[in-house]
């Protein structure tokens, strides 16, 4: 938060509890921001409000002042149980809940109020015990709170006096709306409690929720998205897909030491971008949905302290973050939703400061640009991708194959997949000849004349067993995934098993054969049934 004088309304001019006013002054808050000046007079009078304001405009302090002032000014119920909180604040993400808690403790921790922070990803039993001991204000994410609400002896909302929904539009985006309705139905009647709703956009679905669960809320709009984006210096580049990393590195080299956030649309590409920045020598942190909660908190703390230069994040992970001093925001991928664009660039230019937002519109995401420009009601200036901006990428080292040649670094798994794909297409990798120091004989034509059983996609290498005449030994092949015992046929979909004839004594080495070919004739000697039939015919001819 900041005490930057964005309005002339002083906190001392409001009807605040003396202890609360002292805490605000001690924390450095003297003048109100526009959203605070607009909402505090209405909310302090006990009215419900639906306020529209961007993150970083001071709305967190606005509803915290209302909550704390109400609890200090009005005594709680005498028969209130420890598990009955007087106030509830709901946030869509863990990071936002943590930041609200930290702000609440900053100026309200010495006022005799107990705050409880409830969110997933951390010790379940510890939080449950905290709720059982009692708290005046519960700051929570919906999912973990519902878990405790279903355990009736842990927490109850039957005497809750005031409820706050922060980032209400994000609740819809993350699919929490059913959870929110579940929680609101367990509060006292809407005429018996006060409800404050804050959202970056007061869309139809947000207002529908407000009118359904709030008591004649007053709609208050502090500023539109266009006003917010005018404080951000925006520009957009149109790079090819392969130019995005070099362009990002080139632009970052021109703003060394600046606190930067890079937004990527998917978790898969987050890792790739972060790896490229790390290899270029930057101190990088990754914030995505797969990062464990404790690690997320550590990363945010290090980024806030300046130990990390760049934070690469997805929209879900970074929504609602309150990080001061972010100078640059890069949209490595243009977002699909225009609202997400506004939320991204809102990480910079907070509380009246200036910032830079740089976007890349590649062929994959450029179609989002018209909607974004229509939403913010302005054209984003276009910058040219020049050769001077593209940083050269170092070529990866190539390993030697032992013969003086260099080979690409192909992982064994990728090689196995490639070999399997080629065999499924009937095109074996490589040509007959030396392989792993052993001679290889090319695959011959099918002995069944092309008819009969369908060939399988597996292959086996068979070799003569010199100790057993006429035995065929299937050996582990590249794409079989099965190790066979000597003298036994192995494979999928073999059907009826047949005895195989011995190999021609003139053959040597390895023969590449399918499992179907292993089971058919492989030499000139007749099978056992053939020899028996020949013997019977000979005996009949004697008579």
Swiss-Prot record:
GO terms for cellular component: cytosol. Residues 422-466, 487-509 are annotated as: Disordered. The keyword Nucleotide-binding applies. Its EC number is 3.6.4.13. A motif (DEAD box) lies at residues 166-169. CDD domains: DEADc, SF2_C_DEAD. A motif (Q motif) lies at residues 9-37. Residues 231-391 form the Helicase C-terminal domain. It comes from the Bacteria. Component of the RNA degradosome, which is a multiprotein complex involved in RNA processing and mRNA degradation. Belongs to the DEAD box helicase family. RhlB subfamily. This is ATP-dependent RNA helicase RhlB. It comes from Xylella fastidiosa (strain 9a5c). The gene is rhlB.
